[in-house]
Structure formats: C-alpha cells, structure tokens
Amino acid sequence: MPSIISDPQAYDIMLRLLQFSCWSLSYINTVRTTLSDQLPSVSFMSICCDVAWEFVYAFVYPIASSHWAGGIRIWFAMHCVMLFIVAKYAPNDWDHVPLMKRFARLAYVAITIGFMAGHLALASEIGPALGFFWSGALCQITASLGSLCLLVCRGSTRGASIKTCPLCWFYIAITLTLDAIYPVFFFYFRAIEHPKKDSERKVE
C-alpha cells in the first residue's frame, strides 16, 4: 500500500487539510483575543482584503477555488463573524484619530468593497485561476505586514496573542523551518540539473 507521501493526490489533500485546520484555528484565536482585549487582533487591511478575496472566489469565481472543495466558503463565513467582532471593537484602536474612531466601522465596509473591486479587476485582467493565486498572495502579505504594523504602531502587545498561544509559536516555527529548508533543496536540485552550466560559470 503506497504511503501518503508517494501518492501526490493524497499528499496534496493532506496538506490542504492541514492548512485549512491551521487557518481556521488562527481565525478562532483571533476572535478569542479580540474579545479578551476588546481590541482588534488583526490588521485593518488584512481582514478586509481576506473577506473580499473569499467572497470573490467563493461566489463570483467558485470554479477557481473548486480544488478547496468549499473550504473558501467556510473561511468566508468565519471571516464574516470575525469582521463583525473586530469592527465592534475597532473604535477602541483609534482614540488618537477622532474622525477614524467615529467612522471605523464604515471604513471596514468601504475598504472591503474596495478590495473586492480590486480582486475582480485582477481576475478579469489575468483570469480567475491566476487571480486566485496572486490575490491570495496579496492577502498573505497584508496579513504578515499588517500584524507587524499593528505591533509597532500600538507599541503594545494588546490584541496580539503570540506570547500566550502555543499554536502561534508552532505556526512560526513550522513556516520558518520550511522557508529555510526550501532554498537548500532548490540549489541542491539545481546543481544536479545543471552541473555543466554551473562549472562553466565558475571557470569564467
């Protein structure tokens, strides 16, 4: 009986289930931390970009996310709950900007619609399949950059749960480990594929 790793399809499904589980747990933890600190634990741009992306590829271009077997729709539902809770406490994050404090909830809606238009425009420009990937990459960048910006701008760990959440440490450890391993294997296989070219370059 072939192992999961030797079966590409089974391996792919296993990785998707792992990713789905980790992101879902991350969303649940975000809600828990927001309710606990009464302060958004996810960046403004990040959640708006995510909700917009999930709406576009769950309902407008579902075929582009069909390989997730409905997972995007589940994430969209979870994100809507998260957005409602985050928006509820959003004014607490804007005491230094009275105008934003007053219209924070409206801003969440407006920015989400703006990102939605952007995702749709990109999909129409390069196609839903590529749009799904590149828009998803943008979501990942805003999530990583947004979390850092929140921490630096606030100068406080309120709203952030890295110290108290073992799952966060696991996520950081596994992603950094995999990112560190990737270039090692990349250059290893590159050396095997192009030994002659590499040796010629060294001679030159």
Curated annotation (Swiss-Prot):
Gene Ontology biological process terms from the UniProt entry: terpenoid biosynthetic process
GO CC term, one of those recorded: membrane
Keywords assigned by UniProt, alphabetized: Lyase, Membrane, Transmembrane, Transmembrane helix
Chief location category: membrane
Location(s) in or outside the cell: Membrane
E.C. number(s) listed in UniProt: 4.2.3.-
Its membrane topology: Multi-pass membrane protein
Domain of life the protein comes from: Eukaryota
Phenotypic effect of disruption: Impairs the synthesis of terretonin but accumulates dimethylorsellinate through the decomposition of an unstable intermediate.
Pathway(s) of this molecule: Secondary metabolite biosynthesis; terpenoid biosynthesis
Molecular function (Gene Ontology), one example: lyase activity
InterPro entries: PaxB-like
Bilayer-crossing regions: 44-64, 67-87, 103-122, 132-154, 169-189
UniProt similarity note: Belongs to the paxB family.
Role description: Terpene cyclase; part of the gene cluster that mediates the biosynthesis of terretonin, a fungal meroterpenoid that acts as a mycotoxin. The first step of the pathway is the synthesis of 3,5-dimethylorsellinic acid (DMOA) by the polyketide synthase trt4. DMOA is then prenylated into farnesyl-DMOA by the polyprenyl transferase trt2. Methylation by the methyltransferase trt5 then leads to farnesyl-DMOA methyl ester which is further subject to epoxidation by the FAD-dependent monooxygenase trt8 to yield epoxyfarnesyl-DMOA methyl ester.
Protein name: Terpene cyclase trt1
Source organism of the structure: Aspergillus terreus (strain NIH 2624 / FGSC A1156)
Gene: trt1
